Amino acid sequence: MDSSTWSPPATATAEPLQAYERIRNAADISVIVIYFVVVMAVGLWAMFSTNRGTVGGFFLAGRSMVWWPIGASLFASNIGSGHFVGLAGTGAAAGIATGGFEWNALILVVLLGWVFVPIYIKAGVVTMPEYLRKRFGGQRIQVYLSVLSLVLYIFTKISADIFSGAIFINLALGLDLYLAIFILLAITALYTITGGLAAVIYTDTLQTVIMLLGSFILTGFAFHEVGGYSAFVTKYMNAIPTVTSYGNTTVKKECYTPRADSFHIFRDPLKGDLPWPGLIFGLTIISLWYWCTDQVIVQRCLSAKNMSHVKAGCIMCGYMKLLPMFLMVMPGMISRILFTEKVACTVPSECEKYCGTKVGCTNIAYPTLVVELMPNGLRGLMLSVMLASLMSSLTSIFNSASTLFTMDIYTKIRKKASEKELMIAGRLFMLVLIGVSIAWVPIVQSAQSGQLFDYIQSITSYLGPPIAAVFLLAIFCKRVNEPGAFWGLIIGFLIGVSRMITEFAYGTGSCMEPSNCPTIICGVHYLYFAIILFVITIIVILAISLFTKPIADVHLYRLCWSLRNSKEERIDLDAEDEDIQDAREDALEIDTEASEEKKGCLRQAYDMFCGLDQQKGPKMTKEEEAAMKLKMTDTSEKRLWRMVVNINGIILLAVAVFCHAYFA
């Protein structure tokens, strides 16, 4: 059927105000209000029922989490509004291949639970840079990696999530983009700054349920509207806009026609927009950084009761990662069928009219579907879903970023900072992070032909591979030492950042107006660039390590895969830093004893709300401290549960292979 019957003039020329009017009904507003009340209630319950008055309680939820909130939180931390907007947008523009990004994670979560987390737990660490400090000694890698991780959070995660959430609110409520951002962040910051990791994980679990429920309903509506799966395939290939020329310029056919390989995940290695070797190897490298070495993800696993709960949480997350292809990518493609003129626009003036940016409007595919297709009440639910995904991602990132700053950077500046000072510093840092992220939003708006998901993946391809290389070699190659790891990170970063800056300087261009960036720099697909950068970093690390002094095994017990089960006592390379930490804790005790004066009611309420009332239990003896440390670094599992999670892990890998093969 010709696509023109699927783009009614009324919707094609709809202004945001009409969409805004649609939300103005009792059912939608009630659902949104109820949603916010429930989320705040869960956040407040977690806030008052968990220990947030210590660094371990605020940042690691006291290592008491069971598998299902961990699985839900892993999924919710990963799936932000950037996925709803970005995956659906790239799906509308180029077909199902972008779903391969999600399915790749099925393999990586197994690696995370079975290989990486056991090492991190045995090392007894809270942050990823802290692991590298124990593994290599010295402080420069730890500080460098903390700063780089924070830069990545700002450039990719926070900016993209804020931008995509604001697109949705702008379309649905008619609010100014930056006012929408401000309101969102105010609510998000409130319970992250006050609540700590337990509040984040419990609200994530609630929001995962809402997110899946809402997107299942929308997918059902979308497929019903388009006439089922086979009609969807036919109609998508015919979803071509009618306006394809302006002035004396006619748009090239490939700019507005759906790709011939739209329904294949694996695409041509040279001409494909997502070449299959890049999707298999390049994406796995980026995913290794994201899933196995990134603070946001690993922190959830480190909060688990024991290893079986870690693995079960990873499996649960893996199964849920099957869904975005059907709940986000395909609805985005259906949005192109139903609202072709708007979503598939190619003429710059038309695009600017519909979504305020000249490079393309595919980013509004999912929000448009929600606003135009859903009945009253359900539309409010879907707006709540978008807010849920945005806020769950932001809360996760804010909590993890403040952990990195507090534990890895602030403690270097203020070596004798009290626990209370660390808690306040972490919370204040979140406010700085928010400000910088908002300033970056306009750049996100115009990058990668207006395709948000491509922007996120390209930035991680330029900055992530060196980190992945260092962690991989740190765990599997005990010969690697500090000079090798440090210079590998620095050289890898310089190569990646030079590509990133060049691309931003020239602009990524669009199908209509290609970028003038030199082919030798920007002509290499970002997934291929990730492979090249990863290999160069590994060569540099190994070469420098082999020419410099190795680290003795006594410093590496339980920090490398080959020495993971050793029972000998490890002499940490950062033992001096540990002494400073102990001295700080002793000073803290003296400090708290000295300041036991009676506080007023207002001060007590303030401390309780912000989690600054350190719950003081009886002081532990040295033997009790040693037993506690043993519990925190224990990776043992009951035989039955180990078998159950192992069998499920194998099934998950088989499902991943089947999905890739079926849609190849």
Swiss-Prot record:
<feature type="disulfide bond">
    <location>
        <begin position="517"/>
        <end position="522"/>
    </location>
</feature>
<keyword id="KW-0762">Sugar transport</keyword>
<comment type="similarity">
    <text>Belongs to the sodium:solute symporter (SSF) (TC 2.A.21) family.</text>
</comment>
<dbReference type="InterPro" id="IPR018212">
    <property type="entry name" value="Na/solute_symporter_CS"/>
</dbReference>
<feature type="site" description="Implicated in sodium coupling">
    <location>
        <position position="300"/>
    </location>
</feature>
<feature type="transmembrane region" description="Helical; Name=TM4">
    <location>
        <begin position="177"/>
        <end position="193"/>
    </location>
</feature>
<dbReference type="GO" id="GO:0035623">
    <property type="term" value="P:renal D-glucose absorption"/>
</dbReference>
<feature type="transmembrane region" description="Helical; Name=TM9">
    <location>
        <begin position="423"/>
        <end position="444"/>
    </location>
</feature>
<feature type="site" description="Involved in sugar-binding/transport and inhibitor binding">
    <location>
        <position position="460"/>
    </location>
</feature>
<feature type="topological domain" description="Extracellular">
    <location>
        <begin position="663"/>
        <end position="664"/>
    </location>
</feature>
<feature type="topological domain" description="Extracellular">
    <location>
        <begin position="222"/>
        <end position="275"/>
    </location>
</feature>
<dbReference type="Pfam" id="PF00474">
    <property type="entry name" value="SSF"/>
</dbReference>
<keyword id="KW-0472">Membrane</keyword>
<keyword id="KW-0813">Transport</keyword>
<feature type="topological domain" description="Cytoplasmic">
    <location>
        <begin position="194"/>
        <end position="202"/>
    </location>
</feature>
<dbReference type="GO" id="GO:0016324">
    <property type="term" value="C:apical plasma membrane"/>
</dbReference>
<feature type="transmembrane region" description="Helical; Name=TM13">
    <location>
        <begin position="645"/>
        <end position="662"/>
    </location>
</feature>
<feature type="disulfide bond">
    <location>
        <begin position="355"/>
        <end position="361"/>
    </location>
</feature>
<dbReference type="GO" id="GO:0005412">
    <property type="term" value="F:D-glucose:sodium symporter activity"/>
</dbReference>
<feature type="transmembrane region" description="Helical; Name=TM1">
    <location>
        <begin position="67"/>
        <end position="90"/>
    </location>
</feature>
<feature type="topological domain" description="Cytoplasmic">
    <location>
        <begin position="296"/>
        <end position="309"/>
    </location>
</feature>
<feature type="transmembrane region" description="Helical; Name=TM3">
    <location>
        <begin position="140"/>
        <end position="169"/>
    </location>
</feature>
<dbReference type="GO" id="GO:0001951">
    <property type="term" value="P:intestinal D-glucose absorption"/>
</dbReference>
<dbReference type="GO" id="GO:0005794">
    <property type="term" value="C:Golgi apparatus"/>
</dbReference>
<keyword id="KW-1003">Cell membrane</keyword>
<feature type="topological domain" description="Extracellular">
    <location>
        <begin position="91"/>
        <end position="95"/>
    </location>
</feature>
<feature type="topological domain" description="Extracellular">
    <location>
        <begin position="1"/>
        <end position="24"/>
    </location>
</feature>
<feature type="disulfide bond">
    <location>
        <begin position="255"/>
        <end position="511"/>
    </location>
</feature>
<keyword id="KW-0915">Sodium</keyword>
<feature type="transmembrane region" description="Helical; Name=TM10">
    <location>
        <begin position="452"/>
        <end position="477"/>
    </location>
</feature>
<feature type="topological domain" description="Extracellular">
    <location>
        <begin position="332"/>
        <end position="375"/>
    </location>
</feature>
<feature type="disulfide bond">
    <location>
        <begin position="255"/>
        <end position="610"/>
    </location>
</feature>
<feature type="topological domain" description="Cytoplasmic">
    <location>
        <begin position="407"/>
        <end position="422"/>
    </location>
</feature>
<feature type="transmembrane region" description="Helical; Name=TM0">
    <location>
        <begin position="25"/>
        <end position="47"/>
    </location>
</feature>
<dbReference type="GO" id="GO:0015371">
    <property type="term" value="F:galactose:sodium symporter activity"/>
</dbReference>
<feature type="glycosylation site" description="N-linked (GlcNAc...) asparagine">
    <location>
        <position position="248"/>
    </location>
</feature>
<dbReference type="GO" id="GO:0031965">
    <property type="term" value="C:nuclear membrane"/>
</dbReference>
<dbReference type="InterPro" id="IPR001734">
    <property type="entry name" value="Na/solute_symporter"/>
</dbReference>
<keyword id="KW-0325">Glycoprotein</keyword>
<feature type="topological domain" description="Extracellular">
    <location>
        <begin position="505"/>
        <end position="525"/>
    </location>
</feature>
<feature type="transmembrane region" description="Helical; Name=TM12">
    <location>
        <begin position="526"/>
        <end position="547"/>
    </location>
</feature>
<keyword id="KW-1015">Disulfide bond</keyword>
